[in-house]
Amino acid sequence: IIDRYLLPQLHSAITPGKGVVLYGPRQVGKTTLVMELLAGTTLKTQLISADELRYREALASQDRHVLGNLLADNELLIIDEAQRVENIGLNLKILVDQFPKAAFIATGSASFALANKVSEPLTGRTLTYYMYPVSYGEISQTYGPFEAREQLNRWLIWGTYPEIVMEEKAPKREQLLGELVGSYLYRDLLELNGLRKPEKIVDLLRLLAFQIGQEVSLAELATSLAINRATIDRYLDLLEKVFVIFRVRGFSRNL
């Protein structure tokens, strides 16, 4: 198991009458982190997954009694895949307001979906954390600084999703990356309602892959893909919100 820097921060963030929202890409280790948190807490805890219909329906009820039955006599309620719950922000607000002696954690992979649903109702009621693939510091802490430095090229080429880091065989790493891209990263985008040309996002990613670390022209991207600049900007925003890309703004002293 790779020790994650975020674990002690989550432990200290658990406060009665408050919520914690944990965002991160799929397969980055959020559920594993939550399980480690469970193993290290003395609080009576209920862990539920919104992948299960019965929990999804209860969490979407906006009914104090239904939500109270879900919490029962637990001191900490953890909701995994919370973005799948309709009006999750409002229902979390009800939980936080109506059950001030309990603490709550909600995790989600599609940050845009979860953020839009939780930010306004939970203003002042939550702490927000972002979980990313394993950092070089975490690798060094787990495997030792010498091994981390020796394997630096490997991390740079293959990336540092936890399963990729722990897999020793290159063919298996390649298979895992293919599944990760096809089954998880694209899914959040391609299942979006109103996304009229999902194939254009895939084409956009291919173009961006050749420009990593370089200045990117939205006008050139729009011309290459035969779509307007506003659509390119929207697609880039979506890609950033589901953790596929990270935009680095140009440096300027004239702020």
PLM regions: where:
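Conserved lysine of the Walker
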Residues: 30
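Conserved catalytic/switch belt of AAA+ P-loop NTPases
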Residues: 89-112, 119-121
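Short regulatory helix/loop adjacent to the ATP-binding pocket of P-loop NTPases
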Residues: 112-128, 143
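Accessory nucleic acid-recognition modules appended to NTPase machines
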Residues: 14, 170-255
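Hydrophobic positions on the alpha1 helix immediately C-terminal to the Walker A/P-loop
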Residues: 33, 37
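Pre-Walker A adenine-sensing motif
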Residues: 1-14
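Short glycine-rich substrate-engagement loop in P-loop NTPases that contacts/grips substrate
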Residues: 45-76
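Hydrophobic anchor at the beta1->P-loop junction of P-loop NTPases
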Residues: 22
